[in-house]
Every structure is written in structure tokens, then in C-alpha cells.
Regions:
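N-terminal cap/leader regions of alpha/beta-hydrolase-fold enzymes
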Residues: 1-261
Length: 261
């Protein structure tokens, strides 16, 4: 359990929807969207690395128990929430997810408070696709997708409507923004077909990186190398996952106009 006591806990409301947000650091903002089952200690660890790089880390509490260790039971409980199911179903149909609307509002709040040219965002696992959906917003200058895992029943699916992908591509071209994406080669939740589909839709604006499975540390209850910057990251010099972590944080820093540490 991580008490998260080095973060400032706030509440943010938009369209009658209120979520807690944990904020740490100074400098331009980076939204760290948690993976299932929520803000785990490893998600918080990544946010602290963002903070220590001279950026402001903002973690919205979208589901689960804040600070709790991950487990299959907690993930099933989070996925089974009616509110969470409605969010993902709306996103999948292209009808426009209230969650994306709220996250775009949060991006505006964070940008107004922290300044800089814009914000960064990283989505992980179930929230990986949300980072791409947010890239329609000109505030988002550094979008990162880490093992985007939806839809689970279609390895080539992007979980974003075709018209929305066209609009996102146009915005990326207009503002010269690229999308970084990461997965492990043998990840059964985020397979090669999804990255192929995203490459087809986004062209050279999509910058994928595929890590070999033997670069992963722990795999956790999922049973395969999966969580690139959290559970499976090995925080040691010379480790590929640590290098990827550094690459992502440098991408945030340079895109948001601060010197990379």
C-alpha cells in the first residue's frame, strides 16, 4: 500500500462528474492515467519520476482503491464497476466518452495552473487509448500510449472511431506532434495487430517501440510481460525498461520546453 502522502489530493468537477486527482511537483503538467486496477504503488512511482524530472505529475483517480497493491481480485472489481463499463462502452462506440471530456477538462485545468506550452499525457493498459483520444486537443503536446489494451476481444482494434482517428491525425499533422507507444513483444493484451492498425491510421505520427519479453522484470498476476513502465520495469542501470522510462520522460520534458535531466 502506498499512502500517496507526498501528493496533494484535490477534487476536480466537470459536467457533474467529480474525481480525485493527486498532484506533485512543479513545472509543466503531465497527466498519468492509471492502469487497472487503479493508482497502484508502481503507477505512483512513475509519477514521482515525472515529478523528479522537473515536471508536475497529475494522477486522476478513475477507478479502484487509491494506493492499493494490484491483484486479480482488485482488477475484476474495478472492471466490474457499472460506471467504468459505461465509460469504456461509450468510448468504443465513438459516441464520445464522458471520461475523455472530463480528462480534457483536467488537461485545461492543469495547463492553466502549471503553464508551459502544453501538457503531456500517458495512458496505460485500459487507459492507453484515452491518451490517444486526448491528442485531438491542441493542449496535448506529448501523448504516450503504454500497452493500450482495448478492445480485449479484437487484437487489431483501436477502440477509437475511424472518423475520430482521421481528426486526430489531422491535428497531429497540423501541430507537428507525434504519439509514442510501447508494448512487449509477447503481450497478449496488446498485440502487434493493434500497433499495425495505429500505424496505418496515424502514419509517421505514430512512433511505436516493441520491447523483447526478456527485458521485462516481474509480470504480476497477468502472467505475461505487460506493464512497461510499472510492474515490469526494472529500475537498474543498463536495463531496457529503465531506458524506455527515461526516453518517455525526456519526450515529456523536451516537448514541454524544459531541459531533460
Amino acid at each position: 500500500m502506498d499512502p500517496l502522502d507526498d501528493f496533494d489530493r484535490r477534487t476536480v468537477m466537470h459536467d457533474d462528474r467529480t474525481f480525485a486527482v493527486y498532484v506533485a511537483g512543479d513545472g509543466p503538467a503531465v497527466l498519468v492515467l492509471p492502469e487497472m486496477p487503479g493508482i497502484t504503488p508502481d503507477v505512483a512511482r512513475f509519477a514521482r519520476w515525472v515529478r523528479d524530472a522537473g515536471l508536475s505529475a497529475w494522477i486522476p483517480s478513475l477507478f479502484g482503491v487509491d494506493g492499493a497493491d494490484p491483484s486479480m481480485e482488485r482488477t475484476i472489481e474495478s472492471m466490474g464497476s457499472p460506471c467504468v463499463r459505461r465509460e469504456f462502452e461509450a468510448f468504443a462506440t465513438g459516441a464520445g466518452s464522458p471520461m475523455v471530456s472530463w480528462l480534457r477538462h483536467l488537461a485545461g485545468v492543469a495547463h492553466a495552473e502549471c503553464g508551459g506550452p502544453g501538457i503531456g499525457v500517458i495512458g496505460m493498459c485500459f487507459t492507453g487509448n484515452f491518451a490517444l483520444a486526448m491528442a485531438i486537443d491542441p493542449t496535448v503536446l506529448a501523448p504516450v500510449m503504454s500497452q493500450p489494451s482495448l478492445p480485449l476481444d479484437d487484437p487489431a482494434g483501436t477502440f477509437i472511431a475511424d472518423d475520430d482517428l482521421v481528426a486526430i491525425r489531422a491535428r497531429l499533422d497540423r501541430d507537428d506532434v507525434e504519439v509514442r507507444a510501447y508494448r512487449f513483444e509477447g503481450d497478449t493484451y496488446c498485440q502487434a495487430a493493434r500497433f499495425d492498425a495505429l500505424s496505418s491510421a496515424l502514419g509517421d505520427r505514430f512512433r511505436p517501440t516493441v520491447l523483447p519479453d526478456d527485458a521485462a522484470g516481474e509480470v504480476g498476476w497477468v502472467g505475461v510481460p505487460h506493464s512497461v513502465v510499472t510492474t515490469s520495469l526494472v529500475d537498474e542501470h543498463g536495463e531496457l525498461t529503465a531506458a524506455v522510462r527515461d526516453e518517455i520522460i525526456e519526450f515529456f520534458a523536451t516537448s514541454l520546453g524544459i531541459p531533460a535531466i
